[in-house]
């Protein structure tokens, strides 16, 4: 039997969700609207990396499904010490991808507005004022805005 090498790759990302609540007394996790979990193809109880854009903190927890149409993104348990209401966060889930598939692997990337409504599904912004072109092999200049309407930063 031959061991298949795997790479840990980004599987899904919810970009710039707005935190609506934090409850240090809850047992743990991050509450996410079910509509966003489905759009991102993230399962309840799946491991989540949470990157707090506002505070610069990072943590790992798991997703739990919030109430339908609630738009609530809530930090629960110990995470509530690092994430506060009003913070913008990026939620990321990873998967082990066979080495043979790594070069063509495409994660599911969703972008939300300040009300945690799905804005669009699309390509990763490659860097300030850059984006991947249609075949993802070249970088081209972009005048795009961030999902919340802010201009992309100049330079790196």
Swiss-Prot record:
Its EC number is 4.1.1.11. It is found in: Cytoplasm. One of its GO terms (biological process) is pantothenate biosynthetic process. Gene3D superfamilies: 2.40.40.20. Its cofactor is pyruvate. Is synthesized initially as an inactive proenzyme, which is activated by self-cleavage at a specific serine bond to produce a beta-subunit with a hydroxyl group at its C-terminus and an alpha-subunit with a pyruvoyl group at its N-terminus. The active site is at 29 (schiff-base intermediate with substrate), 62 (proton donor). The modification Pyruvic acid (Ser) is found at residue 29. Keywords: Autocatalytic cleavage, Cytoplasm, Decarboxylase, Lyase, Pantothenate biosynthesis, Pyruvate, Schiff base, Zymogen. The keyword Nucleotide-binding does not apply. InterPro entries: Asp_de-COase-like_dom_sf, Asp_decarbox. One of its GO terms (molecular function) is aspartate 1-decarboxylase activity. GO terms for cellular component: cytosol. It catalyses: L-aspartate + H(+) = beta-alanine + CO2. Signal peptide: none annotated. It holds the Pfam family Asp_decarbox. Substrate binds at residues 61, 77-79. Binds 1 pyruvoyl group covalently per subunit. Belongs to the PanD family. NCBIfam families: panD. Catalyzes the pyruvoyl-dependent decarboxylation of aspartate to produce beta-alanine. This is Aspartate 1-decarboxylase. It comes from Rhodopirellula baltica (strain DSM 10527 / NCIMB 13988 / SH1). The lineage of its organism: Bacteria, Pseudomonadati, Planctomycetota, Planctomycetia, Pirellulales.
């Amino acid at each position: 039997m031959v061991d298949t090498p795997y790479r840990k790759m980004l599987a899904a990302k919810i970009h710039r969700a707005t935190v609506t609540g934090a409850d240090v007394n809850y047992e743990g996790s991050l509450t996410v609207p079910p509509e966003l979990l489905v759009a991102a193809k993230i399962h309840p109880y799946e491991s989540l990396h949470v990157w707090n854009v506002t505070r610069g903190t990072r943590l790992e927890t798991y997703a739990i499904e919030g109430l339908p149409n609630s738009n609530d993104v809530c930090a629960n348990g110990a995470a509530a010490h690092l994430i506060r209401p009003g913070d913008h966060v990026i939620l990321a889930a990873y998967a082990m991808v066979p080495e043979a598939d790594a070069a063509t692997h495409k994660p599911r990337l969703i972008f939300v507005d300040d009300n945690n409504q799905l804005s669009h599904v699309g390509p990763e912004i490659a860097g300030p004022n850059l984006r991947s072109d249609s075949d993802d092999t070249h970088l081209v200049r972009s005048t795009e805005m961030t999902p919340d309407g802010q201009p992309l930063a100049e330079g790196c």
